[in-house]
Amino acid sequence: MGKEVDVSTLEAGGVRDRDYADPPPAPLIDIDELGKWSLYRAVIAEFVATLLFLYITVATVIGYKHQTDASASGPDAACSGVGILGIAWAFGGMIFILVYCTAGISGGHINPAVTFGLFLARKVSLVRALLYMAAQSLGAICGVALVKGFQSGFYARYGGGANEVSAGYSTGTGLAAEIIGTFVLVYTVFSATDPKRNARDSHVPVLAPLPIGFAVFMVHLATIPITGTGINPARSLGAAVVYNNSKAWSDQWIFWVGPFIGAAIAALYHQIVLRASARGYGSFRSNA
Amino acid sequence: MGKDDVIESGAGGGEFAAKDYTDPPPAPLIDAAELGSWSLYRAVIAEFIATLLFLYITVATVIGYKHQTDASASGADAACGGVGVLGIAWAFGGMIFVLVYCTAGISGGHINPAVTFGLFLARKVSLVRALLYIVAQCLGAICGVGLVKAFQSAYFDRYGGGANSLASGYSRGTGLGAEIIGTFVLVYTVFSATDPKRNARDSHVPVLAPLPIGFAVFMVHLATIPVTGTGINPARSLGAAVIYNKDKPWDDHWIFWVGPLVGAAIAAFYHQYILRAGAIKALGSFRSNA
């Protein structure tokens, strides 16, 4: 009985020994999903997740700067507070928690650059991508506004958690740091959500949010000295809107152009090089 | 029916029918078939990109930390200004975790010539693949550090370029010993994480493999940063030495190849011959339950 060949599989042209199937490209406009509650639930989840992300992280930044302010906390304040390492942990750890919580609901993007990368890879529809980005941006603004609402004096005094290119670094350096940082993040997201890897891991994706959180943490360690680390346009937008300072606004373009370019490069690298989905390579037999 | 199957498979496959894993056969030194597969070149590209990202993130973290703790640049109270040496150790360990996770299914996630060398000694990769990986890792490291220098060249030169060299107060023997033991810890963890017997015991779900490898790197950095800045990865040391290009890193550079390769060899021997009882199998004088 077991020896019988599954003719339908052979006729479909699929490789029979593979126990995973790459999902078909998402349509640009999916009329069906517009009528489903799951789309709106996902959008709400992205909004709330991004709101929480910005509230926790910006509150951490403001608290750190207050505790290390010599004029507010005494002359030996420099070593108080959670430190830059603690800020990096806040960003990375919060992404881990929130991706874990929302992965099954919205895919756990929490970042317009991630949504853009997945859209380029045809894993989300255009409508869904736009709704997610809008929800993320609004959530970010609300999250930072909560921080300002609760500690407005400190918020304005300590830079509002806004992303700006630091003194001593050029605009080009900031842009490059954002591009590479977002590449690391989106590349990790692609690896974590790859159906082939899920099949190899016996379809147990339990660890997927952890490397994504660690990727955010790592990029923050490397990039905080340069730009305060954006790699998330919603995060940068939220702080710029609520802080509303000319320096933050004049550098804002870096935090959209850089992440979107980095996400696009990551999408190309993963889809074309690693998954070899461009079947134009006639000279190699692909085992993707 | 059930008993016949057991007896038959037992007779045909030798003893211990209860094992639900098989050790893969030793990789051939030269595998002509794999040279024609895209998967080999994809793996080499993945190793290059992974090592490039590893060096970019980690060296940028080192330079950023030194800049933020530089009193002449960031004020008199700068000593606690950066991510700290702990943050640097996290950057190395965390980045290895992320990158091993991303490339494990593509290239095995080595990102380190010492790991490749250890796995080659254990016959888990072919000679050609090992050499290609090592070249890709070294080139990726050079490009990664090159990116850091391109983006912040003044700070890169001023703050030592993230290069590995022996710290003052430590002898070369101490540095070499630290690199040997540090790499032993890392490669031994890699062997344990990729052991087919352990995968069988864990129901063939290798999801956690990259995490202890990343933590091993993190732990070794905590211990060895004061001694040598921690190499335990010849590509990492080479990348920084090439781009920074000063006498001191080059004088000490041999430590960062001899130490890691010796440590990897010891780890390969320990895991394959003692823990997996490869020698006992060969001798046949003990009944092995490997």
Curated annotation (Swiss-Prot), chain A:
Sample GO molecular function, one term: water channel activity
GO cellular component, one term: plasma membrane
Pfam families per UniProt: MIP (PF00230)
Gene3D superfamilies: Glycerol uptake facilitator protein
Keywords: Cell membrane, Membrane, Repeat, Transmembrane, Transmembrane helix, Transport
Renumbered ranges of motif NPA 1: 111-113
Keyword Ribosomal protein set for record: no
Disulfide bonds: none
Location in the cell: Cell membrane
Segments traversing the membrane: 42-62, 81-101, 130-150, 172-192, 206-226, 254-274
Domain of life: Eukaryota
Membrane topology, from the record: Multi-pass membrane protein
Ranges spanned by the short sequence motif NPA 2, renumbered to the chain: 232-234
Function: Aquaporins facilitate the transport of water and small neutral solutes across cell membranes.
PANTHER family given in the database record: AQUAPORIN OR AQUAGLYCEROPORIN RELATED
Domain remarks: Aquaporins contain two tandem repeats each containing three membrane-spanning domains and a pore-forming loop with the signature motif Asn-Pro-Ala (NPA).
Protein family: Belongs to the MIP/aquaporin (TC 1.A.8) family. PIP (TC 1.A.8.11) subfamily.
Protein's recorded name: Aquaporin PIP2-6
Provenance organism: Zea mays
UniProtKB/Swiss-Prot annotation, chain B:
PROSITE patterns: MIP
Organism: Zea mays (Maize)
Lineage: Eukaryota, Viridiplantae, Streptophyta, Embryophyta, Tracheophyta
InterPro entries found in the cross-reference section: Aquaporin-like, Aquaporin_transptr, MIP, MIP_CS
NCBIfam families assigned: MIP
PANTHER family, sorted: AQUAPORIN OR AQUAGLYCEROPORIN RELATED
Family: Belongs to the MIP/aquaporin (TC 1.A.8) family. PIP (TC 1.A.8.11) subfamily.
GO molecular function, one term: water channel activity
Protein's job: Water channel required to facilitate the transport of water across cell membrane. Active as homomers. Increased activity when heteromerization with PIP1-2.
GO annotation, biological process: protein heterotetramerization; protein homotetramerization
Extent of motif NPA 1: 112-114
Upregulation: Expressed in roots with a circadian rhythm showing an increase at the end of the night period, a peak during the first part of the light period and then a decrease.
Protein name in the entry: Aquaporin PIP2-1
TM spans (from-to): 43-63, 80-100, 131-151, 173-193, 205-225, 255-275
Keywords: Cell membrane, Membrane, Repeat, Transmembrane, Transmembrane helix, Transport
Motif extent (NPA 2): 233-235
Chain residue ranges for the region called Disordered: 1-20
Assembly with partners or alone: Homomers. Can interact with PIP1-2 to form heteromers.
Comment on protein domains: Aquaporins contain two tandem repeats each containing three membrane-spanning domains and a pore-forming loop with the signature motif Asn-Pro-Ala (NPA).
Tissue and organ expression note: Expressed in roots.
Transport in keyword set: yes
Membrane topology label: Multi-pass membrane protein
